[in-house]
Amino acid sequence: MALRWGIVSAGLISSDFTTVLRLLPRSEHQVVAVAARDLSRAKEFARKHDIPKAYGSYEELAKDPNVEVAYIGTQHPQHKATVLLCLAAGKAVLCEKPMGVNAAEVREMVAEARSRGLFLMEAIWTRFFPAVEALRSVLAQETLGDLRVVQANFGKSIANVPRSVDWAQAGGSLLDLGIYCLQFISMVYGGQKPEKISAVGRRYETGVDDTVSVLLQYPGGVQGSFTCSITSQLSNTVSVSGTKGMAQILDPCWCPTELVVKGEHKEFPLPSAPGEEFNYTNGMGMCYEAKHVRECLKKGLKESPMITLAESELLADILEEVRKAIGVTFPQDKC
């Protein structure tokens, strides 16, 4: 049976995800509805992607009995309201990262999903790329020896993108880019809570975080560090170092196709998407998380074992603590 998707928001990321779903077997994935706050935008999106139903409100999509799982592609501050709306209507939910602007928002969504017995997952698509799966295998086999250090950085000059510097929309480098670095560190150290967090950063003129460097100490004295920036191009790589060697995820680390282990270079090409254009780098890689959601739902799971709800809460806790350390608060923090 095909998993029936409803797409919440007709923006660029939703377009890429819908393109991917269209390219997957129709016996496994079907997009049955799209909703935008403007009906004309929803209809235009539906025409482009051959979607049978277009709604001018998120409420209408949530009420559609044909929708099994909702993909939330709204702006950061709208995630909580749209996730809660879809959960209240009995839908499974895949929510774009960051799941919430702060830890309280994430906890509220997680509590709602658990109380209703519904599936909820934060769409950290990076976790599902074959290059990252290969890295996990390397770690499981202890190829690198005892792990000591994880270093990651992700920076692009995107201050010209209005959303990236919009304080009201919870822009800035941490929630947009830093979360990718942090999730790598968290993955390597098994979702443990860091014992110590320190951070330095500069703010952009709009009040969002511009460039931030974070140092995390974990149990056993092992470390993780990352730098993220919306005004500077960084190397956009991840390195994991142990007593027997190093592994590197190469640029683009957030959607990687290359892994170097102790100097041995391995490539993991994306599935082909002939004739399709994506808004974001390696957009076809969203197929891996889509397939994962279907597998989880087929098994009757309420959360993903690859990115648990507890880990989503932990990531939100750390990101919020870092923001506080550098003096960045958003309107949602005062609620």
UniProtKB/Swiss-Prot annotation:
Residues under site feature: May play an important role in catalytic activity: 180
Free-text tissue specificity from the UniProt record: Liver, lens, spleen, kidney and small intestine.
Gene: DHDH
Catalytic reaction list: (1R,2R)-1,2-dihydrobenzene-1,2-diol + NADP(+) = catechol + NADPH + H(+); D-xylose + NADP(+) = D-xylono-1,5-lactone + NADPH + H(+)
Record comment: activity regulation: Strongly inhibited by isoascorbic acid, 4-hydroxyacetophenone and chloromercuriphenylsulphonate. Stimulated by various salts.
Subunit and interaction comment: Homodimer.
Keywords for this protein: NADP, Oxidoreductase
A GO biological process held by the record: D-xylose catabolic process
Domain of life of the source: Eukaryota
InterPro entries per record: Gfo/Idh/MocA-like_OxRdtase_N (IPR000683), Gfo/Idh/MocA_domain (IPR050984), GFO_IDH_MocA-like_dom (IPR055170), NAD(P)-bd_dom_sf (IPR036291)
Protein name: Trans-1,2-dihydrobenzene-1,2-diol dehydrogenase
